[in-house]
Amino acid sequence: GGNTPEAAAESIKQAVAMGFNCIKTGVGLRGNGRVIETAEHTENVVAIFAAMREAVGNSVDIAIDFHGAVAPQTAKRLVKALEPYHPFFIEEPVQAQNVDVLADITRSTSIPIATGERLFTKWGFREVLEKRAASILQPDLSHAGGIMETRIIAGMAEAYYAAIAPHCPLGPIALAACIHLDASIPNFLAQEGGRITGEGYIKTPYKQVNGYLPLPTAPGLGIELDDEAIADKIGHDWQNPKAYAEDGSAIDW
C-alpha cells in the first residue's frame, strides 16, 4: 500500500510483478481516533484503494484490513464507499469482541467480512458463526489452539458456508503449519504470509509460484531449521508499530 494513490498503485504493481495474485492492504491513512472521521478521510481512503484497483484490474484479489481500529460509525461509511471497487474482503472493520456490532456491519454490505486473528479456540469462533457476523474466519494457528483445534474451527465454519484464511504474520514455522491445514480443508480461501520466505531460518526457503506455495513433502511440517542462521538472531528486539492521533493520544496501529 501507500499513503497516496500514486504510491499505492506502484506498490501493488510491484507485488503483482513478483507473482502475487491476492494482496491485502490497510486503511493506510490513520484517522484521529474520532468516532466519526471526516468526509475527507473517507474520500482519501477510497481514492487510494481505487488507484490500486485501477493499477491491476479486476483479475487480482485485493483485500483491505481496518485492523479493528475504526469506530463502527466510520467503518460503515468506509465499507459502503469501497463497494464499487470490489474488495476481496474487509478484515476487522471493527473489533471482533463485540460480535453484534460486527454482525450489523456484515448485514449492511455485500462485501465479505473477515475476522478471527484475536479469537481463540472453537469457543471464541462459535458466536461469530452463530450470529453470521463474518463469512471469512482468520484463526491464527499459533494462538487459536494449533493445527487440530483450527481444523475443528474450519469444520464449524464449513457448516455456515464460511471460508478460512489463516492469519500468519509470525514466521516460517507457523506458516508451515498453516500450509498443512490449508491443504486439508475444503473451505480454504487464502493464506496470509506470502512474503515470508524463511530465508535465514529454514534450510530450504519458501518460493511462491504464480501466487501459490508448493505443498511440503518432507516429514513433519516439511521444513528443516537452519540452526546456525537462527543463532545470529537470538535476542533480536522487535516491537509493534505505534500510532498516534494529531493530539498525541495513542490509537490502535
Set out the residue ranges of the language-model regions:
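Metal-dependent enolase-superfamily TIM-barrel catalytic cores that perform enediolate-based chemistry
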Residues: 1-103, 108
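Residues at secondary-structure transition points
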Residues: 34, 217, 226-228
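Shared catalytic-loop signature of beta/alpha-barrel
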Residues: 80, 86, 97-220, 224
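Extended hydrophobic packing segments that form well-structured cores
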Residues: 221-253
